[in-house]
Amino acid sequence: MIYFDNAATSFPKPKEVIDAYNFCLKKSCGNPGRSSHSLSLRASEVIYEARERVASFLNSYKPEGIVFTYNATHALNIAIKGFIHAKSHVIISDMEHNSVLRPLEKLKKEYGVEVSEFSTSAPDLESEIDKYITSNTVAIISTLASNVTGRRVNLASLSHAARKHGIYLIVDASQAIGHIKIDLKITPCDVLCAPAHKALFGVQGLGFAYFKDTTRGLTLMEGGSGTDSISTEMPLLLPEGYEAGTPATPAIAALASGIDVVDKIGLNNIENRLSELEKELSERILSLPKTKIYGADMGIVSFNYDNIPSSYISAELDKHGICTRSGLHCAPSAHKKLGTLTCGTVRVSLSFFNNRREIEKFYKAMGEIAKRI
């Protein structure tokens, strides 16, 4: 099997990540913060060490600002529904995932929130954002990289625009983290949301959010936090203020190990290798007649063959043992921009662990598929 669906979730997982997960299940899986026995205390240590590891990876000095969530979608919902008030205005990119679009749609219908889209292809991103600022604009919400094309959105420009206008910046780093350096001291934001299971090589069912302000806003969910149990309200301070219920300790341990793997390889090495593989893959795809590529970055290459439905091509590749993703990728705005809203695209998404031999097999498979059509 050739796995080219890493933008959905990375596979295979590094041995270090699997070992950390299994070790936690066997040795450190008490309920953290709920009891005073040794297993509970060790689980609490695992979680705190992971907070420190995530904070260090982002060059943040606030481990208490790292909140563990079920996934990046959960993190984005906490941020969006906690920061955006009724009748306010937000500015988003034209490449957003449904994890941003759908929460905002709910706020539009129920609370009269207004939404404007800026163009990620504008030559001057900051000036482009400036055009949409109004007196009731409260936030910029943007991906750092499209999950359809890999197109990057410059964090420095987003950060400067938000600070200039005194508004929140909420960042979706799902497709960028683990691929490029994110330094929150140099390019600050108010909230950064990410999953564990993509380029950080963690497991599904875990994400996190970084909050610059460690006093919580409105809560999305309430419950036990292991602290201040006499109160019927969630704690005001983070991380407990947003972490209701028992956390996924083994997954959190695996995330810390995944970050160690990324650091060991080196972000520059990851970026350079993916750039080389993207280039070779793009050249191979374009050497086939009737193909069109819509973008190639962050390990993502999206394409279509002739006028054939992307779902058909992806299904045919699966028969050759090649895993890709077709359709709209939960990002209709991006496909509207690309002109692929009716057909979607075939998305090939690579990781550091893919190789040229797999690209060659993909090319041969596409050649055989093209002959049969």
PLM segments and residue spans:
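Pyridoxal 5′-phosphate
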Residues: 1-373
